[in-house]
């Protein structure tokens, strides 16, 4: 009965979220205005003349009115035609479209890099217009400012570098970081994305060039979550690089030393964390693309003391859980059947282990959260790494992967052995889901996909989640051509839907972390939660899973369109705030203290979130002497 009641409790939570998607929001006549943003009051600036035109936070370009041009001493420094926001966007889009026509028949890399350069130049001179363009064209430009193009940008960053963005802390700065943080001009920082460049996407050690991924992530925090761009900070911690090509490159911008390791490495990260939380006690720090060796250790070291999370581990896991729950629905099964799903996972790095741990916890929660439940959940996973199937017979198993090592007697009954190939495991296990987090492009070969034909599921799910595109374990064309149309396909990188003929379309879902991390960050910020708890992450994943309607699920759609990212983020953030309140972690945000926050119902929480999402609009600027 305990197991049944837990199943029903989880199921009812998800059903409630599904019903909320259908039900219209009820507007109470006595509803309060929960916004704590500045609104449309004039903004005081302490710059004039060329200084204001060279400041991307305040520069409006040709949109400055004549009264502002007089006030700010910029009359005559701009062309006389005062252009509207819409006209500026149209001019910028015309430039990009001309580039698209010129590059249509050329190689793809120069094309996307040229687009990135144009967007980056706009970012450097006018942040408001940049984010307006990005928000209004998010489906087209998210792949340019974020994955997959950001991977190419990081590889070429030393050559592309023109103007600094963010902060750089290095091994040479030991003992100085506490004072260095005061070199950043913003007195308030809400969100930091930090990397050490050791494992950028699936591209390996890119050293200091990895800051490109932190910049791209924060662009999405602004565009999707409405974090104020003046309160975000991309950070690179340069502890050296083991990339021999970079060490030999005279144009490389980072330290040309091998990476620090052991206690020396930990001391640098500790000093950084102490410094940023001393200056900005309420900041949220997202760790990004740290190698597996350190990702879990740093997460466990800091998560109970600081407002931080690791997107590669926790964000990827949440997106995968939402997709797996969607796959259960798409297979025509009740949500509580999730613990019965057989899942083969290719990849045992930080992302793979993060997904495994989250899926195991979700299954165990459905089964009653007992020791027996955790053991039962463990038995639903088969993990394959570069050496093959991981079993208890494996020597020197990574401690994080050890809980998922298969027992010898179990696999012998299945006709498998230690080190069995992925194709052999898929053929014998007949899984409901094949999940790829290996960063090994093409790993789901024809042999592997042919083996999946024997799945016991009537609609098997394939998740090649590795980024960037070249690291995807398979393409949708390969999957649909071998397995037919009755599959669920979700990838980490964007792919176009596949024309299957006869008017049928193979839907390509994108299992993109951007569906979750902006909402997790925004919800943590607005709740004032002391930490980012497992419950808050679970609430985010369940909210995303419930966002898709039954009609969409039946068509094989388990993730929403990126064009809806702003609304998705609002709902995810509201779910995170609600969970933080229920766990008694919420301490409030600015004027909304914890007592007022606890009085809000679900509709009011959603309103509170929406009212505190920054939107790109030009404020009236008024000059005041320092």
Curated annotation (Swiss-Prot):
SMART domains, alphabetized: malic (SM01274), Malic_M (SM00919)
Q: Name one GO molecular function term.
A: NAD binding
| Reactions mediated catalytically | (S)-malate + NAD(+) = pyruvate + CO2 + NADH
Lineage here is: Eukaryota, Viridiplantae, Streptophyta, Embryophyta, Tracheophyta
Superkingdom of this protein's organism: Eukaryota
Q: Can you say what this protein is called? A: NAD-dependent malic enzyme, mitochondrial
Principal place of residence = mitochondrion
Q: Binding residues for fumarate, per the UniProt record?
A: 91, 125
Please, one GO biological process term? Answer: pyruvate metabolic process
Cofactor(s) of this protein: Mg(2+); Mn(2+)
Q: Where in the cell is it found?
A: Mitochondrion matrix
Quaternary context = Heterodimer of two related subunits.
Q: Where is the active site?
A: 146 (proton donor), 217 (proton acceptor)
């Amino acid at each position: 009965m305990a197991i049944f009641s837990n199943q029903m409790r989880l199921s009812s939570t998800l059903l409630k979220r599904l019903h909320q998607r259908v039900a219209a929001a009820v507007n109470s006549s006595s509803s309060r205005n929960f916004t704590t943003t500045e609104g449309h009051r004039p903004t005081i600036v302490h710059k004039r003349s060329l200084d204001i035109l060279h400041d991307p936070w305040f520069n409006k370009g040709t949109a400055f009115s004549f009264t502002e041009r007089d006030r700010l001493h910029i009359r005559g420094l701009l062309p006389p035609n005062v252009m509207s926001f819409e006209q500026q966007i149209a001019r910028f889009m015309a430039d990009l479209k001309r580039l698209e026509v010129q590059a249509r028949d050329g190689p793809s890399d120069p094309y996307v890099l040229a687009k990135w350069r144009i967007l980056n130049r706009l970012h450097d001179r006018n942040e408001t217009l940049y984010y307006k363009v990005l928000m209004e064209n998010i489906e087209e430009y998210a792949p340019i400012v974020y994955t997959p193009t950001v991977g190419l940008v990081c590889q070429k960053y030393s050559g592309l570098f023109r103007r600094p963005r963010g902060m750089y802390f290095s091994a040479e700065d030991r003992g100085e970081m506490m004072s260095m943080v005061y070199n950043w001009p913003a007195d308030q920082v809400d969100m930091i994305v930090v990397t050490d460049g050791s494992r950028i996407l699936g591209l390996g050690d890119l050293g200091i060039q990895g800051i490109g991924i932190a910049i791209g992530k924060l662009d999405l925090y602004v565009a999707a979550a409405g974090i104020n761009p003046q309160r975000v900070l991309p950070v690179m911690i340069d502890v050296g690089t083991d990339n021999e090509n970079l060490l030999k490159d005279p144009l490389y911008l980072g330290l040309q030393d091998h990476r620090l390791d052991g206690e020396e490495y930990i001391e640098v990260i500790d000093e950084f964390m102490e410094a940023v939380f001393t200056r900005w006690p309420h900041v949220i720090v997202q760790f990004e693309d740290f190698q597996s060796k350190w990702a879990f250790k740093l997460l466990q070291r800091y998560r109970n003391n600081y407002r931080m999370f690791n997107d590669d581990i926790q964000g990827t896991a949440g997106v995968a859980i939402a997709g797996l729950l969607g796959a259960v629905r798409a297979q025509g099964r009740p949500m509580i059947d999730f613990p019965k799903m057989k899942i083969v996972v290719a990849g045992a790095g930080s992302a793979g282990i993060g997904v495994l741990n989250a899926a195991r916890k979700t299954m165990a929660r459905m089964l009653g959260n007992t020791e027996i439940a955790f053991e039962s959940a463990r038995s639903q996973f088969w993990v394959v790494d570069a050496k093959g199937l991981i079993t208890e017979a494996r020597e020197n198993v990574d401690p994080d992967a050890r809980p998922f090592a298969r027992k010898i007697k179990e696999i012998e009954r299945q006709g498998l052995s230690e080190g069995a190939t992925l194709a052999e495991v898929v053929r014998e296990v007949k899984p409901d889901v094949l999940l790829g987090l290996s960063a090994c492009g093409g790993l789901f070969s024809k042999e592997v996909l042919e083996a999946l034909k024997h799945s016991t599921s009537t609609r098997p799910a394939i998740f090649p989640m590795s980024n960037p595109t070249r690291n995807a374990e398979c393409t949708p064309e390969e999957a649909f051509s071998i397995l037919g149309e009755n599959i669920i396909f979700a990838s980490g990188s964007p792919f176009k839907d596949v024309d299957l003929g006869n008017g049928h379309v193979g839907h390509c879902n994108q299992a993109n972390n951007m569906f979750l991390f902006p909402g997790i960050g925004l919800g943590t910020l607005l709740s004032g939660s002391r930490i980012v708890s497992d419950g808050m992450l679970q609430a985010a994943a369940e909210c995303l899973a419930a966002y898709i309607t039954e009609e969409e699920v039946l068509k094989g759609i388990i993730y929403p369109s990126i064009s809806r990212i702003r609304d998705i983020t609002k709902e995810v953030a509201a779910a995170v705030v609600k969970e933080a309140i229920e766990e008694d972690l919420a301490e409030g945000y600015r004027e909304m203290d914890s007592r007022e926050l606890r009085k809000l119902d679900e509709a009011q929480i959603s309103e509170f979130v929406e009212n505190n999402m920054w939107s790109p609009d030009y404020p009236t600027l008024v000059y005041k002497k320092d």
